[in-house]
Amino acid sequence: MTLDPNVAARLKRNAEGLFTAVVQERGSGDVLMVAWMDDDALDRTLKTREATYYSRSRGEQWVKGATSGHTQHVHSVRLDCDGDTVLLTVDQVGGACHTGDHTCFDATVLL
């Protein structure tokens, strides 16, 4: 797969070629998680509507829910004004967090 050159030209990546993905639940508006993407992960996400991310620790792409069954069906992808973050709007099946929680932001409230 190859990311559309017009989209690729707008992206601002870090030194590792990655950019941030913020994931929001379509129905509730809850922020579910933040992850990393590379061009190929974004391209796969756009073409399949399966949320695909890049794992820095494993050095590879991963499709959300491929092993856990906690999938994300992508309804929209938006690029922010700086080009360094995308916002995915998804239908979440199961927990979005690796802990099994619905969102990665269910923990301690700081303020």
UniProtKB/Swiss-Prot annotation:
Names of the cofactor(s): Mg(2+); Zn(2+)
Main enzyme class: hydrolase
Keyword 4Fe-4S part of the UniProt annotation: no
Catalytic activities: 1-(5-phospho-beta-D-ribosyl)-5'-AMP + H2O = 1-(5-phospho-beta-D-ribosyl)-5-[(5-phospho-beta-D-ribosylamino)methylideneamino]imidazole-4-carboxamide
E.C. numbers: 3.5.4.19
Locations listed in the record: Cytoplasm
Record's cofactor remark: Binds 1 Mg(2+) ion per subunit.
Pathway: Amino-acid biosynthesis; L-histidine biosynthesis; L-histidine from 5-phospho-alpha-D-ribose 1-diphosphate: step 3/9
Alphabetical list of Pfam families matching this protein: PRA-CH
Alphabetized UniProt keyword annotations: Amino-acid biosynthesis, Cytoplasm, Histidine biosynthesis, Hydrolase, Magnesium, Metal-binding, Zinc
MF-aspect GO terms: magnesium ion binding; phosphoribosyl-AMP cyclohydrolase activity; zinc ion binding
A single cellular component GO annotation: cytoplasm
Family membership noted in the UniProt record: Belongs to the PRA-CH family.
Function: Catalyzes the hydrolysis of the adenine ring of phosphoribosyl-AMP.
Protein name listed in UniProt: Phosphoribosyl-AMP cyclohydrolase
Gene, per the UniProt record: hisI
